[in-house]
Amino acid sequence: MTAALTLMAKDRDGPKISYQVLMIPATDASVDTASYHEYGTGRFLARAFMKYAWDLYAADAAARNNPYVSPLRASLQQLQGLPPALVITAENDPLRDEGEAYARKLQEAGVSDARGEIAR
């Protein structure tokens, strides 16, 4: 949510956001990363539940491709000018790969970032 709201605030000329902290962010509606397949069978954040939740939130492909829904799908140009970000992922979490991918994409777009990983 932080990623989408920060992008939206930039696109709509406010409010000005100085810094973003993304704690284990869900940044893509595909639910199809290696970490989802490796850790998405547990009792806390199951891949099947996340697929169900995404179906409720954004039922069709057009909605899921919207950068306000899946910030990882934003272009580098759309991400340029965002405030600095702290992206925190968890080592054994289904959302790890998409959080790390989003942090890399922010860096490619020239957004100052710091990354942290919560180890097991």
What residue ranges belong to the model's regions?
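Alpha/beta-hydrolase superfamily serine-hydrolase fold, recognizing
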Residues: 1-120
